[in-house]
Amino acid sequence: MRRRPRASLPGMAGGELWLVRHGETEWSASGRHTGTTDIELSDAGRRHAQLLRQRLAGTEFARVLTSPLQRARVTCELAGFGDRAEVVADLAEWDYGQDEGLTTPQIREKRPGWTVWAEGPRGGETAAEVGQRADRVIAMATQSARTLAFGHGHLCRVIGARWIGLDAAEGIRLTLSTAAICVLGHDRETPAIVRWNDTSHLD
């Protein structure tokens, strides 16, 4: 597990970043890689997004960001933040290239042992390239005291890894459910994961 020197951790600039993965879609429910395909939320996904509203209502956010893809934007709107959200291209999901729409078992039929984290998708982004986008999101978020960002599964996992100075591919160690909340903050001055994959509002 590779770590960067403490002085260069992306989260060192301060602030708190709350990440919300979009609600369920038909593709996410079936395990299909959903990158640039602009798929809508399922009925369950919309219900889960609405449950986020009450959970997040009591917290003040200086800034709200969202991916341009509708599954994240609609989650943001149903959670009550659509009127103030900034659309940020870097919050879009990993570009899976030719592996878009396929499940991991389908991909492994031709490439045994494949993971998006190590080998990457055919004709899509590498983990390092997604990591560069994650760093830009972190740099934007840490300009404010507390930022709320609506994004996607793999992208948010990369942001979590980069916040604490790990390589983007170490996001493989951070599982993330749909409509889950994550909080990235600090232990004194050190960037830390305060909360991860919180779905208690869906119970």
What is the predicted role of each segment?
Residues M1-G15, W94-P105, Q143, A161-D203:
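Acidic, low-complexity terminal tails and accessory targeting/binding regions
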Residues R2-G11, Q50-T115:
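Phosphate-coordination/substrate-recognition cap region in phosphate-metabolizing enzymes
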Residues G15-T75, R122-D135:
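Loop-to-helix element that buttresses phosphate recognition and phosphoryl-transfer chemistry
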Residues L17, S144-H154:
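Generic beta-sheet signal
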Residues L78, V158, R162:
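Active-site signature of alpha/beta-hydrolase-fold catalytic machinery across serine-
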Residues E109-E129:
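Short glycine/proline- and acidic residue-enriched helix-loop micro-motifs
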Residues G153-R157, D187:
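GST superfamily/GST-like fold recognition
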